[in-house]
Amino acid sequence: MFKSGFITIVGRPNVGKSTLTNLLMGEKLSIVSNKPQTTRNNIQTILTGDDYQMIFVDTPGIHKPKHKLGEYMVNSATDSIKDVDLVLFLSNPCEEVGRGDKFIVEQLKNQKAPVIFVLNKVDESSPEKVAKTLELFSKEYDFAEMIPISAMKAKNTDKLLELMVKYLPEGPKYYPDDMITDVQERFVVAEIVREKALKNLSQEVPHGIAVDVIQMKQDDNGKYNIEVDLICEKASHKGIIIGKNGQTLKKIGSTARYELERFLRAKVNIKIWVKVRKEWRDNTSLLKELGYKKLK
């Protein structure tokens, strides 16, 4: 019997959704950073086994929006819960169930798919706190299963995969065996550059940046020539991104090039231009140009 279905991964910002997706896939497709709200789009990845096919939707963290980009991220995450076959609800060990988690629980009550509660980052907590957290969440919702894991350390993730297969419905193979994502290469390129910017910039700047791939061409020798605009909201941020003698921008470019060459399996030449677009996160037309389509 072949099983298949769509699986959405939800949770507050920075609970490890992208890390878990990347671990299960064995490919770096979702942007990973220690800063919250790094995933902005629902990234669809495909995992095919001998008797199953899982289509993962890695969502932005659900949080109280402060601008139109935030509204897009929250709408995108809550919409992904609808019409799926299985939901993974990720959280971390805690002393009490917070407002963000309670909000997600309320969204879950409006759908019929089974929900597996996944308690991530248990390697960073005591067994007592892990047990207490599982007990707290068991009182909030009738979960199909509850499982503690560490996505970073790959602890108990094999058991999680078994549970996911268990709750998938019988179904067809939606995608070819060798297809691992439905997103375009240009999108992944932009996400890689944005990840490197996040890791090399201060707390004030990162979430005010976006990446627009202006050009992506492969020459006769197979080398990619890529040009991107790194968009920020303030002139002062532009100076921070470039850095003294251009050192910060050079570091973003060199680390991005290394990751891009691994992803594209080819040599890469990348040029990054820093541009100021004031209050772009509240500019609906510009947001749509940058790929955030679900704005009302």
Swiss-Prot record:
SUPFAM superfamilies in UniProt: P-loop containing nucleoside triphosphate hydrolases (SSF52540), Prokaryotic type KH domain (KH-domain type II) (SSF54814)
Protein origin, superkingdom: Bacteria
PROSITE patterns per record: G_ERA, KH_TYPE_2
Cellular location(s): Cytoplasm; Cell membrane
GO MF annotation terms: GTP binding; GTPase activity; ribosomal small subunit binding; small ribosomal subunit rRNA binding
Segments of this protein annotated with the region G1: 11-18
CDD domains named in the record: Era, KH-II_Era
Coiled-coil zones: none
Name under which the protein is recorded: GTPase Era
Originating organism: Clostridium perfringens (strain 13 / Type A)
Gene: era
